[in-house]
């Protein structure tokens, strides 16, 4: 199965946004709450598939063949939409879905390693171009900054470019690109 809470922040947004009662949280706590609900939404889709298969008498492992989170969007998921796309939210979703995968024993393919700027040829900022954990040049997005610090990518490169952090590793600069999800009424 595939699950994309990122896309569902627009197409099935019941879980997405800042809920009543969360107004007094810090901005980061508001986003963390929304991202926890995104992870729970993905898990609920998995559980629905599992329940359906069980109702049919099918006893086979279920794998999440794709899930991920885009970091840039000039469409439904950007400033004029759900405001879901940025590196901070991607990092939170990546961490939460990996945590759940490890705890539950469910295999998850996180989509994807590198951005694919050729997917939406009409817009370089189209969300489908930016699901990577790395930019096309090989810069590690925020989800992997800790791995850069640990030296995991030491000696590796992409097209001759060493693996470095996006935003030159400046968390404050990265956070300035982060928008709050909309407030639910």
What feature does the model see in each segment?
Residues 33-44, 81-89:
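Alpha-helix N-cap and loop-to-helix initiation/capping positions
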Residues 58-61, 104-106:
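Short, well-ordered coil/turn segments that N-cap beta-strands
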Residues 64-66, 108:
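Conserved, mostly hydrophobic/aromatic
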Residues 8, 74-75:
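Extended, well-ordered alpha-helical segments in internal regulatory regions
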Residues 75-96, 100-185:
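Aromatic-rich peripheral "rim/lid" segments of glycoside hydrolase catalytic domains that contact
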Residues 43-50, 94-98:
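Generic structural signal for well-ordered alpha-helices
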């Amino acid at each position: 199965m595939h699950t994309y809470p990122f896309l569902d922040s627009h197409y099935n947004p019941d879980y997405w946004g800042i809920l009543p009662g969360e107004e007094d949280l810090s901005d980061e706590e508001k986003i963390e709450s929304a991202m926890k609900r995104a992870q729970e939404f993905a898990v609920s889709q998995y559980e629905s598939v599992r329940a359906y298969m069980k109702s049919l008498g099918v006893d086979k492992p279920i794998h999440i063949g794709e899930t991920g989170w885009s970091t840039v969007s000039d469409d439904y998921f950007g400033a004029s939409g759900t405001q879901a796309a940025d590196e901070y939210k991607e990092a939170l979703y990546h961490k939460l879905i990996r945590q759940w995968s490890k705890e539950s024993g469910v295999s998850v393919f996180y989509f994807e390693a590198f951005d694919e700027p050729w997917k939406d040829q009409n817009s370089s900022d189209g969300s489908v171009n930016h699901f990577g954990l790395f930019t096309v040049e090989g810069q590690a997005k925020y989800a992997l900054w800790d791995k850069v610090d640990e030296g995991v990518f030491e000696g590796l490169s992409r097209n001759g470019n060493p693996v470095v952090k996006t935003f030159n590793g400046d968390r404050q600069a990265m956070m300035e690109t982060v928008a709050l999800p909309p407030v639910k009424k």
